[in-house]
Amino acid sequence: MSKQIQIPDIGSDEVTVTEVMVNVGDTISVDQSIINVEGDKASMEVPAPEAGVVKEILVKVGDKVSTGTPMLVLEAAGAAPAADEPTAPVADAPTAPVVATAPTASAIVEVNVPDIGGDEVNVTEIMVAVGDTITEEQSLITVEGDKASMEVPAPFGGVVKEILVKSGDKVSTGSLIMRFEVLGAAPAESASAPASTSAPQTAAPATTAQAPQAAAPDTTAQAPQAAAPDTTAQAAQSNNNVSGLSQEQVEASTGYAHATPVIRRLAREFGVNLDKVKGTGRKGRIVKEDIEAYVKTAVKAYESGATAQATGNGVANGAGLGLLPWPKVDFSKFGEIEEVELSRINKISGANLHRNWVIIPHVTHFDKADITDLEAFRKEQNALREKQKLGVKITPVVFIMKAVAKALEAYPRFNSSITEDAQRLILKKYINIGVAVDTPNGLVVPVFKNVNKKGIIELSRELMEVSKKAREGKLTASDMQGGCFTISSLGGIGTTHFAPIVNAPEVAILGVSKSSMEPVWNGKEFAPRLILPMSLSFDHRVIDGADGARFISYLGSVLADLRRLVM
């Protein structure tokens, strides 16, 4: 009896399949890893929920999947195979690769990007050259998306006649990448790819090798609107149909803009002059996000009555914000320079941080907490547990988490999120706290659930386990969702104070710096006390300055006297 196996609960986000770890015909056992998936800064292996024989694999490397997505068909061990079970993937299988068969004549056939999800990805490597003889499933190009890279295989064999992409190009599902001369293939009158496994000789003109093309077989006629190589013809098309923005923003481009035809079409639809947009892609290429950010900024400026006084390039230059343009400086005139590409995580986190900093009106309060007694108690408990060989080490962060949870109960406005229209407040009845963890792969913020209901030892053990998972890159999407408040601790590195940026949609964040001994007047004399510097940043739309002061003062009092945690 065959059974369809689905992706288990991995959170609400889509993830990318980075490796298929079994083959059709394999006999697998319970909990054997089937596929590897990777989300935003986290990867995991998906185990088999039951044993059996793999009859069909429904996903491939590069597919976007989420909870409930079918990934393979499993036949229970010892079950008789179904008599009418097909021996090859049928043409309408949504995710099964389709392979060309039984060609009848030599022809030029187009090769398109298979189904890799809805996002655009970067071409990072061309793995073949014109004239190469390619076999089926041989890797053609390497593409890289958000924290995941994959190789795009050849759907059929042939000789490479033309390569239509280069390193740095943005491609997506259905993008034309190469043309093959296929010996014995039926002539392709348009952009039709190789025929599917069913009826190869009669279905060739109408059935393509890849699902994205099935809805549009005549892609030759649509080439000016698709991601085709003819950028010259694409760039020369008229801009007379644009409307909606200022004359300066919609005027025809007078210079060369580094953008693909699909981006040029998007710019025309929005009425954007590409000369005004700064590209953030590889080698300054303009990508979809640049267009969206430019339009969003221009619309905000229009709605607020502001006028762009600058003619700089895009959001980074203050376009639409009434700011002076970003200065263009030839730094090489002053000495030797080196220009390096920002990492993908730098670009992604930078965009989020910039959005949060620009949209959220930040206020930061600074204060100090006396943690002399807390630190003495912590060291005493660690020494006791070391003797008992319990394998649990209590860190200052755990006490700070408990103190923050107590403060969130006392000041529930800090445990909220503002709606998108900034008209209502969502008060949360749970307390989940995110803790920033520095890892070799970058900064991640795992979320600890129901901190107010857990004890110091339980939280310490959980912190150790989660930190290990973070360093090994094994955090799942659900591990980093649902936060109410974030703690960013630089105590192990240094600094006295810093101003952390609120992690939207949260409304506050606590920055913790390095503690040090300071003389404190106790009414009779100066006594050495261990002092912890704290920085509280909050959204001023939600929290007043007075409430911010009350929150951080209350937090300091709890850290100074742990007895308040049980009250």
Curated annotation (Swiss-Prot):
User: Entry's PANTHER family?
Assistant: DIHYDROLIPOAMIDE ACETYLTRANSFERASE COMPONENT OF PYRUVATE DEHYDROGENASE COMPLEX, DIHYDROLIPOYLLYSINE-RESIDUE ACETYLTRANSFERASE COMPONENT OF PYRUVATE DEHYDROGENASE COMPLEX
One GO CC term, this protein:
cytoplasm
| UniProt EC number | 2.3.1.12
The record, for Gene3D superfamilies, names: 2.40.50.100, Chloramphenicol acetyltransferase-like domain, E3-binding domain
- Protein function: The pyruvate dehydrogenase complex catalyzes the overall conversion of pyruvate to acetyl-CoA and CO(2). It contains multiple copies of three enzymatic components: pyruvate dehydrogenase (E1), dihydrolipoamide acetyltransferase (E2) and lipoamide dehydrogenase (E3).
Query: What name does UniProt use for this protein?
Result: Dihydrolipoyllysine-residue acetyltransferase component of pyruvate dehydrogenase complex
What note does UniProt attach to the cofactor annotation? Binds 2 lipoyl cofactors covalently.
Q: How does it assemble?
A: Forms a 24-polypeptide structural core with octahedral symmetry.
Needed cofactors: (R)-lipoate
Keywords attached to this entry = Acyltransferase, Lipoyl, Repeat, Transferase
Where do Polar residues bias regions lie? Answer: 239-249
Instruction: Give the top-rank taxon of the lineage listed in the UniProt record for this protein.
Output: Bacteria
* Pfam families, alphabetized: 2-oxoacid_dh (PF00198), Biotin_lipoyl (PF00364), E3_binding (PF02817)
Q: Which organism is it from?
A: Haemophilus influenzae (strain ATCC 51907 / DSM 11121 / KW20 / Rd)
The processes (GO biological process) annotated in the record are: pyruvate decarboxylation to acetyl-CoA
Q: Which InterPro entries match?
A: 2-oxoA_DH_lipoyl-BS (IPR003016), 2-oxoacid_DH_actylTfrase (IPR001078), 2-oxoacid_DH_E2_comp (IPR050743), AcTrfase_Pyrv_DH_cplx (IPR006256), Biotin_lipoyl (IPR000089), CAT-like_dom_sf (IPR023213), E3-bd_dom_sf (IPR036625), PSBD (IPR004167)
Residue span, Peripheral subunit-binding (PSBD) domain: 258-295
**The UniProt record lists the keyword Transferase:** yes
Annotated segments matching region Disordered? 192-249
What is the enzyme's main class?
A: transferase
Bias kind Low complexity: ranges? 192-238
> Into which family does the record put it?
Belongs to the 2-oxoacid dehydrogenase family.
Active site as annotated: 484, 540, 544
Q: N6-lipoyllysine is carried by which residues?
A: 41, 147
